[in-house]
From Swiss-Prot:
Organism: Vibrio vulnificus (strain YJ016)
Pfam family for this entry, one: DUF697
Principal subcellular localization: membrane
Cell compartments where the protein resides: Cell inner membrane
Membrane topology: Multi-pass membrane protein
Keyword Cell membrane part of the UniProt annotation: yes
UniProt keyword list: Cell inner membrane, Cell membrane, Membrane, Transmembrane, Transmembrane helix
Designated name of the protein: UPF0283 membrane protein VV2076
Gene Ontology CC annotations of this record: plasma membrane
Similarity annotation: Belongs to the UPF0283 family.
Transmembrane region(s): 64-84, 93-113, 207-227, 255-275
Length: 341
């Protein structure tokens, strides 16, 4: 008896080579039937318009704040005078003493509020100067640029004997337009302030990165970074000749953060990742050091945005300070103190 199995007949249809679909064959699509056109909403201009309203608010808010302060000061003064006169008429010397003491405290408080409002007014004036500078840069006018730059130099605390300022004055002639005069002032005078500001930003950014990299407490990181950021903004404002009060610092920090939100935070992650990959540090830096690098880059970006808001003349493409140089310095600093052996 044979061990061979009986035959099996398969009745399935065998596809020939001609029946197989050709993968590289051309296919025609009807655009109206196959694809549904959709409109992409552009949110970036809306965000920029919102930021413009935050940075340069309408004049109604200015008058409202001044009116409220004047009304409050008048009511406080009226109440103080009325209390003192009533106590003197009634012979209530204890009430008179308390009224005088409270009046002195109220006067000190009103003085501090008035000083803060004055400094906030100076910050608003800076934004109006920037707006005027933008108009002059975009116009073909003649005869206003030199006076505008001289006023900016006076407000910024640039001395007459400053070599850069003196060189700019000797370079200006009647053949230059207002836009050319502003560009020359930016390249000769404001650039010197930018160099000082860049050194300050680099120092504060590397210090913040190093503090976060070696700090064991998260709450300490937050306090240190906040303190360093406020100190950095205060130093930058001094370089550009602007005296900031407490309210002005808060306002400027809010404007800087709003500006950063418009620009987007994804660039920070991409740039930091590229630096880590290029320097072969991704596998050597600890998680804590990575946080330090991120905080340092964020501080540097914060400082650059503060520079953009504090400069009397808007950035020019060829003179704008880039984040790349400061970023490399931050990564190198953190790597030098936290690299694993």
């Amino acid at each position: 008896m044979s061990d061979l199995k009986p035959k099996q007949v398969f009745e399935e249809t065998i596809f020939s080579q001609q029946d197989k679909p050709e993968l590289t064959a051309q296919q025609q699509f009807d655009q109206q039937q196959t694809f549904i056109p959709t409109t992409i909403e552009e949110t970036e201009p809306e965000l920029e318009d919102a930021l413009e309203q935050v940075i340069r608010p309408s004049g109604r808010r200015k008058w409202l704040a001044g009116g409220l302060f004047a009304a409050f000061a008048g009511l406080v003064g009226w109440q103080a005078v009325d209390s003192v006169l009533s106590a003197m008429q009634n012979g209530d010397w204890l009430t008179l003493g308390w009224s005088g003491f409270i009046s002195v405290l109220a006067g000190l408080g009103l003085g501090a509020m008035g000083k803060e409002l004055w400094k906030l007014r100076q910050l608003r004036h800076l934004f109006s100067v920037q707006e005027q500078g933008e108009k002059l840069l975009q116009s073909d006018s003649v005869g206003q640029g030199k006076a505008f730059c001289q006023q900016v130099a006076k407000q910024s605390g640039v001395a007459e004997e400053n070599p850069a300022y003196d060189r700019w004055k000797n370079s200006v002639n009647t053949a230059h337009s207002d836009a050319e005069i502003l560009q020359m002032y930016d390249a000769m005078v404001v650039t010197q302030q930018d160099k000082q500001a860049t050194k300050v930003i680099s120092r504060f950014a590397t210090e913040s990165a190093a503090l976060v990299a070696i700090s064991p407490l998260a709450i300490a990181d937050m306090l240190l970074v906040a303190w360093r950021n406020f100190k950095m903004i205060d130093t930058l404002s001094t370089i550009y000749g602007i005296e900031l009060g407490y309210a002005s610092r808060i306002r400027l920090l809010r404007l800087v953060l709003a500006n950063m939100a418009v620009a987007g935070a994804s660039e920070l992650v991409i740039d930091a990742g590229m630096d880590l990959m290029s320097m072969d540090l991704a596998g050597k830096l600890s998680a804590r050091a990575g946080q330090g690098v991120g905080v340092g880059i964020l501080t540097a970006r914060l400082g650059l945005k503060a520079m953009a808001l504090l400069r009397p003349i808007p950035w020019q493409a060829e003179t704008q300070v880039k984040l790349s140089a400061i970023r490399k310095e931050i990564v190198s600093k953190v790597a030098s103190i936290t690299l694993k052996p």
